[in-house]
Amino acid sequence: MKIAVVTDSSANLSPQAAADYKITVVNDPIMFGNHVYHENEDITTDQFYRLLKVEKDIPTISQISMAEMQVVFDQLKAAGYDQVLVVGLSSGISGWVNNLKTYAPSVKGLDVQVFDSRTACAGTANMVKLAAAMALAGYAIEDIMTQLTRLRAATTTVLIVNSMRHLVKNGRIYNNSSLAGTMVLRNKPIITFNEHGKIQVLGKERTLKNAQQAVQESFSRFVITSQLPVRLDVISANDDAIAEDWASELRYQFPAVRVKTGAIGPLMGVLTGDHALGMIWSLDWKPLLTALNQERQR
């Protein structure tokens, strides 16, 4: 079976990574008022954050339509694929994944499977790259789904935001609704994705430094208890320099961990607002794949 791997643009895959792993990327829509923009198509990450500063209204997220997905499926079928594995951003953020699960059985000539990453940004990207690498190596789609479930269970996403306004406006807070209104000013809210992929508040700190320290302590506990190689992605919303500085500190403190940096793109930026900072840690998918390949050859 020839398997195509599809994801949405909120994973922030580089064009090179998408090409190397033969991943099809579908661009997410966002809305400023009545104007719809698509990530990477008619708005870049830099343009989004510039627009965020000048627009009066808070933007909202939208979702990829099934008509758009059908075009993608038709193209993949014409390219000779038998199966499609869609690895998408959390269903706690967008209804896209659940709509796809409902729509998939109606796609003719393709076996379409859908996997909910229950996260976003680099967290989704790591799962997508594992899926694509396994597909290229000839693994069955059932085996890929098993390993994605394993990686998802070992993935934690924690974000430090300046304000809860964007999350409240978009209705994306799962818990602590009474707390959200008190955290708009003077504090640094810390949020995460829970086991169901919904965004919830972990707590708050008075300063960014204190918030970073709190997040770092959680990461340190994961590293200490993990018996397998760990990957860490430091992500930011229009604060590359701060993210790079933090990543450098973390590389020094955790030399065995593979540390990368990345952006919070427009779709997730709609929810976090400007100057958010985060860490996504998980098992490192590359050593996982190496171990699978070695076991397969025995």
Listing of model-derived features with the role each one plays in the protein:
Residues 62-72:
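Glycine-rich, highly charged phosphate/nucleotide-binding loops
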Residues 89-96, 117-120, 187:
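Short glycine-enriched loops at secondary-structure junctions
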